[in-house]
Amino acid sequence: MARELNPLQLQQLYINNGLQPNPGHGDIIAVRFTGGPWGPGDRWARVTIRLQDNTGQPLQVPGYDLEPGIINLREDILIAGPYNLIRTAFLDLEPARGPERHGPFGDGRLQPGDGLSEGFQPITDEEIQAEVGTIGAARNEIRLLREALQRLQAGGVGRPIPGAVLQPQPVIGPVIPINHLRSVIGNTPPNPRDVALWLGRSTAAIEGVFPIVDQVTRMRVVNALVASHPGLTLTENEAGSWNAAISALWRKAHGAAAQHELAGVLSDINKKEGIQTAFNLGMQFTDGNWSLVWGIIRTLLPGQALVTNAQSQFDLMGDDIQRAENFPRVINNLYTMLGLNIHGQSIRPRVQTQPLQTRPRNPGRSQQGQLNQPRPQNRANQSYRPPRQQQQHSDVPEQRDQRGPSQPPRGSGGGYNFRRNPQQPQRYGQGPPGPNPYRRFGDGGNPQQQGPPPNRGPDQGPRPGGNPRGGGRGQGPRNGGGSAAAVHTVKASENETKNGSAEAVDGGKKGGKD
């Protein structure tokens, strides 16, 4: 019984194989499957096309029949294609069964002139014997393995024995003299926040001991130095240069520096490590933003003259990249010219000169008294004592009241104190103008004169530090004896002292009679 055939798909297969798309009735087609569910390798089938019935009338549904026999490539039409594509034209077609599925090699004989048969070489007797020996050896090995498995199962199987210790991997690159480096630059700081600046200070020493030529070696050196801080380990990309490595260590320890905090961060770095390290880290933090970093660094330079000189040199350069490259040279030259170190401090020795102690030309009366003799603690119980000639300048400030302003000496050659004498507030029942030694008050506390008389006695008005009413708090009753009016009388010269003493005695007697 003929099987169903799809003429349109069959014509497409003819076209794909370079044939005329005109299949005829009774054509024998050798179908080659180039792949399928059996795996790699070709499989073959042989079919006959049925387009008419026995009377010569066309069939309503074209079909095909399986054709037995070995494929003859000289006479049969060859069509090749994938398994699924061929089954769309020949419905339910499968490779032939038996030796015919191998196509031209089904009978094991060569066909001269056939392209597929030219490279075929049948197996020899020697090869057959060798294959038999290989199969026998494999069977013996399988038998031995089964016996070993039975013995293990009978005796019990324990835990697997650990393998041998792996041999250490060969060293990649040169050996790092880590002990020598530590003896030169010291041990790693215990605080991770100090590692970045410590490494920045040690880069020159590291290069002097162990020159580094590539970033892989730099990465190995840094990781060996910071082995006590596993969180600071660098990768190969982070160790492209020393600046990049230091910046990466800073970010790992401190976090990314925000733009609004960059000025404070660079200021702290400048105080610890100098302006060069602050500039390098600033360029790393900002990805080479010259304008931002220079705007911060210029505020850290010592002096406006240095900033102006550096700015004038940078203005002559072409671009920001050239300015950043020449920044260390410009700053080093300026610091060297000014005699400054990396912190902007003078490296010249300081000459300490002792200032000359010069006596003021016109020292005040209060200053002379403080230099000669300390102030007494209590003057309420002191009696009047005429000053001696050698103490006329030193005793004057001792007798003045603590609340009164300092006054210049009168009648002596000690000079005049030009310090202003403000008016004191009204207190202790004194007159409205306050205690003013250059005003004379009459009865009732009203001023009678606007200046001191040429020769005042103790009874004509108040003296500096005294009371205009002849007495003060803690000095006895107001209507007491005459001694109370003469206790706080102070004279600036010997003549005035003598005259004032006589007048004070007379005034005391009159006060007692009244």
Curated annotation (Swiss-Prot):
Residues 352-514 are annotated as: Disordered. Disulfide bonds: none annotated. GO terms for biological process: microtubule-dependent intracellular transport of viral material towards nucleus; symbiont entry into host cell; viral release from host cell. InterPro entries: Gag_N (IPR004957). It holds the Pfam family Gag_FV_central. The keyword GTP-binding does not apply. Residues 352-394 have a biased composition (Polar residues). Keywords: Capsid protein, Cytoplasmic inwards viral transport, DNA-binding, Host cytoplasm, Host nucleus, Host-virus interaction, Microtubular inwards viral transport, RNA-binding, Viral nucleoprotein, Virion, Virus entry into host cell. GO terms for cellular component: host cell; host cell nucleus; host cell perinuclear region of cytoplasm; host cytoskeleton; viral nucleocapsid. The record marks R182, S183, F210, P211, N223, A224, H488, T489 as: Cleavage. Specific enzymatic cleavages in vivo by viral protease yield mature proteins. The protease is not cleaved off from Pol. Since cleavage efficiency is not optimal for all sites, intermediary molecules are expressed. One of its GO terms (molecular function) is RNA binding. Residues 419-430 have a biased composition (Low complexity). Residues 463-483 have a biased composition (Gly residues). Foamy viruses are distinct from other retroviruses in many respects. Their protease is active as an uncleaved Pro-Pol protein. Mature particles do not include the usual processed retroviral structural protein (MA, CA and NC), but instead contain two large Gag proteins. Their functional nucleic acid appears to be either RNA or dsDNA (up to 20% of extracellular particles), because they probably proceed either to an early (before integration) or late reverse transcription (after assembly). Foamy viruses have the ability to retrotranspose intracellularly with high efficiency. Involved in capsid formation and genome binding. Shortly after infection, interaction between incoming particle-associated Gag proteins and host dynein allows centrosomal targeting of the viral genome (associated to Gag), prior to nucleus translocation and integration into host genome. This is Gag polyprotein.
